[in-house]
């Protein structure tokens, strides 16, 4: 799975959020999930989750945060819409990254 967006390989140069994304991507690859990073500028859409996933026929939107940071109001609207239409919406940080594993194991 090459999602078209490469994160820096040197962890010292990575932001805390980028480190969370890297861990999420590793879990997604372990599960052979289809995923990509949506484009948010230009023709893209603002507020969409950081990573869009399809796994075993399920649509999953993953918003990655660091520490106690929460989704912006627009990000939360998008996450709510995903959940309301039958998808799975996750907000993950360093503390709950195992939630991704749990969802993929279901």
Features from the language model and the residues they span:
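Catalytic phosphate/metal-binding cores of nucleic-acid and nucleotide-processing enzymes, i.e., regions
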Residues: 1-106
């Amino acid at each position: 799975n090459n999602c078209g967006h490469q994160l820096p390989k040197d962890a010292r140069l990575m932001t805390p959020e980028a480190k969370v994304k890297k861990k999420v991507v590793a879990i997604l690859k372990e599960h052979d999930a289809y995923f990509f990073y949506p484009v948010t500028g230009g023709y893209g859409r603002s507020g969409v989750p950081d990573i869009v996933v399809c796994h075993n026929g399920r649509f999953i939107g993953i918003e990655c945060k660091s520490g106690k940071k929460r989704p912006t109001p627009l990000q939360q609207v998008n996450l709510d819409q995903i959940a309301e239409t039958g998808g799975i919406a996750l907000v993950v940080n360093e503390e709950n990254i195992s939630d991704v594993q749990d969802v993929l194991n279901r």
